[in-house]
């Protein structure tokens, strides 16, 4: 009984505003040191799971969906078709090789668009930002998550090459409910390995990013088909030689 009381007392001190006010700098330092150490490790080894996978699993369990399963198969970039590599860059981040994690030109364009348009919010997240968010953070539109995304992206760019960032992005991006990574997506939708994806298949997968819950690969809307066609044009403009600079 005394042991239980001591545990609750320790927890009450840990979560008290006074404790956090006194120790927040130490907590932040330890958090980013741990993130930095993990990024150094994951620079060389396959990623076993991402924070977003864990978030989705827990969310479904809390909703009573015990049948929810994560489909995830890690593959190296050499075993991923250049078509899908080029497709996601064409769709999500055409200045991927030029920026250091943040595309300020895209941010300015998004701000101007959002000020003038009533059609919804346009984002400007780079592949690096999306990778940092999916790997280390949670999804949601709040300032805390957005604030943490900035240093997380900077650490990612500091410790990983562009090639590694793209490799991890392609392996942990969600392409459907519980379907993570291009290998799992390729096998689920097209019954083939990611190594053998055609240009049309790659563009269709990229067209549902970054919101594959609303936009479906297996039931593509007119909007998805239009985006697929646009991605194919952009792939032609970039050219496969773009990937040689990774």
Curated annotation (Swiss-Prot):
Pathway the protein takes part in: Cell wall biogenesis; peptidoglycan biosynthesis
GO molecular function per UniProt: pentosyltransferase activity; peptidoglycan glycosyltransferase activity
First-listed, main subcellular location of the protein, grouped into a coarse class: membrane
EC number, as in UniProt: 2.4.99.28
Entry's transmembrane regions: 27-47
GO biological process, one term: cell wall organization
SUPFAM superfamilies from the UniProt entry: Lysozyme-like
Gene3D superfamilies cross-referenced by the UniProt entry: Biosynthetic peptidoglycan transglycosylase-like (1.10.3810.10)
Endpoints of the signal sequence: none
Taxonomic superkingdom: Bacteria
Topology versus the membrane: Single-pass membrane protein
Catalytic activity: [GlcNAc-(1->4)-Mur2Ac(oyl-L-Ala-gamma-D-Glu-L-Lys-D-Ala-D-Ala)](n)-di-trans,octa-cis-undecaprenyl diphosphate + beta-D-GlcNAc-(1->4)-Mur2Ac(oyl-L-Ala-gamma-D-Glu-L-Lys-D-Ala-D-Ala)-di-trans,octa-cis-undecaprenyl diphosphate = [GlcNAc-(1->4)-Mur2Ac(oyl-L-Ala-gamma-D-Glu-L-Lys-D-Ala-D-Ala)](n+1)-di-trans,octa-cis-undecaprenyl diphosphate + di-trans,octa-cis-undecaprenyl diphosphate + H(+)
Enzyme class: transferase
InterPro entries named among the record's database cross-references: Glyco_trans_51 (IPR001264), Lysozyme-like_dom_sf (IPR023346), PBP_transglycosylase (IPR036950), Pep_trsgly (IPR011812)
GO annotation, cellular component aspect: peptidoglycan-based cell wall; plasma membrane
Keywords from the UniProt entry: Cell inner membrane, Cell membrane, Cell shape, Cell wall biogenesis/degradation, Glycosyltransferase, Membrane, Peptidoglycan synthesis, Transferase, Transmembrane, Transmembrane helix
Pfam families, per the entry: Transgly
Family: Belongs to the glycosyltransferase 51 family.
Entry function: Peptidoglycan polymerase that catalyzes glycan chain elongation from lipid-linked precursors.
Family annotation (PANTHER family): BIOSYNTHETIC PEPTIDOGLYCAN TRANSGLYCOSYLASE, MONOFUNCTIONAL BIOSYNTHETIC PEPTIDOGLYCAN TRANSGLYCOSYLASE
The protein's name: Biosynthetic peptidoglycan transglycosylase
Organism: Haemophilus influenzae (strain ATCC 51907 / DSM 11121 / KW20 / Rd)
Biological classification of the source: Bacteria, Pseudomonadati, Pseudomonadota, Gammaproteobacteria, Pasteurellales
Encoding gene (name): mtgA
